[in-house]
């Protein structure tokens, strides 16, 4: 079965943050975990719901039963067939009202008129609020279309072109194009609506950047600053209907303006925070790149210095080894000129020495030659005797 064409928002963000958190933390909503089917939730609406305001009245000051069950429907994601069953239900008008609320929060704004048109003139009477004021289902549906506020809470905003088309369709049907006030739109912030607890709103709305819608009324409800009575008729007379809408409209205007300004300031703070984070990330990235490039430059320079020193050392060592080899070779191989001169010098010295000996002893070569012829035979015998020894004699 086809689901309802939604506006694309998550169901956790459909309601205001304060209301959503109160629903999720309520004991009654936790009891609804046991309801598993669509029909069980319908039976619970029939038995428990007696108004469709978002907050309970009296001293309870918590989320209403109707909105807890509406949130339960959010989690179930109803189909088109189930929604038609809700809108046409005959047992209780509050079952139908919860169905219309579901469409106002979940459905695409362009499809709202298609859903609501068959019920614009519905004359079934019921009391949307806890004050017992009666209205018809058709008026209630028109107020859901035309109003932005619903009993001190906010509806999703309908785009301006879609709203113009809705107003044009109502004009064609000769129906009012302004909210009638059945949903608390014209008396927003007054004491006859089931307001949220001030403590919850004051604490949670500030933390989430939302302006509490009750701020205009809490000043008037204070026992010290209570304004004098103005003859306000709660049951509603002609004079009250003429004056109170004007006051509530002006109050709503200023409250809306303040809330819009507050939201704009919060968004601007978020954007500035994001820009600051981006600038910080960019600085960190640039610093990391500079640090890496500096490290690479230092390592390259150290490597180049080391290679230069090593090459200089190698050239120096090679030159030293070549010089040593040359010196050794020169020492081992004397020049031939020095050798010839040495030989000549030695020959000269020998000749001079021989000349001196000849002068001293005479020329012995001639004497020996003369003696040799005379004594050749004798010398041979003597030599034989010398070689043979005494046995030869």
Swiss-Prot record:
GO terms for cellular component: spliceosomal complex. Mostly expressed in siliques and leaves, also present in seedlings, flowers and stems, and, at low levels, in roots. InterPro entries: PRP38, PRP38_C. It is found in: Nucleus. Residues 173-393 are annotated as: Disordered. Keywords: mRNA processing, mRNA splicing, Nucleus, Phosphoprotein, Spliceosome. GO terms for biological process: mRNA processing; response to lithium ion; response to salt stress; RNA splicing. Phosphorylated. A motif (Nuclear localization signal) lies at residues 301-308. May be required for pre-mRNA splicing. Confers salt tolerance to LiCl and NaCl. This is Pre-mRNA splicing factor SR-like 1. It comes from Arabidopsis thaliana. The lineage of its organism: Eukaryota, Viridiplantae, Streptophyta, Embryophyta, Tracheophyta. The gene is SRL1.
